[in-house]
Amino acid sequence: MRLRKKWWARPEIEASDKFADEPKELRGKWNKKFNNNNDIHLELGCGRGGFISQLVEKNKDINYVGIDLKDEVIVYAIRKVKEKEEEVKREFKNIKFITMNIMGIAEVFDKNEISKIYINFCNPWPKERHNKRRLTHTKLLTEYKKFIKPNTEIWFKTDDKELFEDSQEYFKESGFNIEYITYDLHNSDFKENIKTEYETKFETMGMKIMFLKARLL
């Protein structure tokens, strides 16, 4: 589904201190941007911010960067964080958002700058000629390895079984060890799950969610 252009979105996100409008200039300087030396975690394809806003609230000593392609999506993620701030009556200084094509992500983060990556319900790109666009594909995992620290974990959730099984091979081929895996997350023994908007919707439909944790060797 193609998003309708919202002309008001760009001015709104640029007015927010949660938005980094020149991310390439921050390469190697993200801790300075956050004004601390805390670990930095990424959510790739953060959508409307339901997931990352919960992380930011729970973990004030971790910095987060949410990435999505469209201004029309990020604007709602910023609003979601503001809503959460109002709810808990506390300003979150540990979150930034950027809009970009993730294919160019290694231009934004430097070696050993990132400590964890979350990938939730990304586009499965089912046609074989489009597989390289998958956020878990070996092509992109190679890019992530340019800026993640040793032993970094990638947490991956999806409702698409073909993507999930292909991704297991992508991780193994790219030098990651799969440390946890389940084909039914909500009925598993994994207790650290935070639900996304999609996940809550899928749960009401009785759909099973697949999840894995992969660690860079």
Swiss-Prot record:
Pfam families membership:
Methyltransf_4
Residues that bind substrate: K127, D159, T196, E197, Y198, E199
Q: Which GO terms describe its cellular component?
A: tRNA methyltransferase complex
Q: Where is this region: Interaction with RNA?
A: 129-134
Give the Enzyme Commission number: 2.1.1.33
- Family annotation (PANTHER family): 3-DEOXY-D-MANNO-OCTULOSONIC-ACID TRANSFERASE/TRNA GUANINE-N 7 - -METHYLTRANSFERASE, PENTACOTRIPEPTIDE-REPEAT REGION OF PRORP DOMAIN-CONTAINING PROTEIN
Q: What does this protein do?
A: Catalyzes the formation of N(7)-methylguanine at position 46 (m7G46) in tRNA.
Q: Which family does it belong to?
A: Belongs to the class I-like SAM-binding methyltransferase superfamily. TrmB family.
Name the UniProt record assigns to this protein: tRNA (guanine-N(7)-)-methyltransferase
